[in-house]
């Protein structure tokens, strides 16, 4: 299909993956390498007065991923997972801003890592835990239109990069559970998405969605 048509063709994917599942004395490790190619990759494209569903010619991605869960002691649990990939529009001739063949799709970081450490303990008869998690993704551009992306970069908002810390502390005794939690405790700030304002003839106004701000909370549960 071309930009502006009502319907998009279905995607056709070809994926090669080779992996292993490894049992550890106190955990496991899953690893895999992959190489995928998607013909008629479906993407939302801005056409001046709105967005339409369009097909890129071919989009490919290759890389590797892993998932590790390990308990070094009876009271400590560790988990870390990661995805490392390179993605590319091999062919995208009919894009709204022109030929995007050879460019990287928006919002596709090369590296994504999630890690968690949990300490389990008992205090005064309360079964308790303390968990800290970290979410990281490397820098990724927000827009695919090179001219629009350049405008955002000039204002210091052209890329998203995540480096977020969360924590949870839980206490359970009999029928009562108490959970204290904090999200984005390091006050990480980034845009999750950005797009040009609809019907802006100058094409210089943009909107964006910020990530969730620092939040704390307390949750109480009682079962009876």
Regions found by a protein language model. Name each.
Residues 1-4, 41-49, 85, 89-98, ...:
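Outer-membrane beta-barrel translocator domains and adjoining extracellular loop/strand segments
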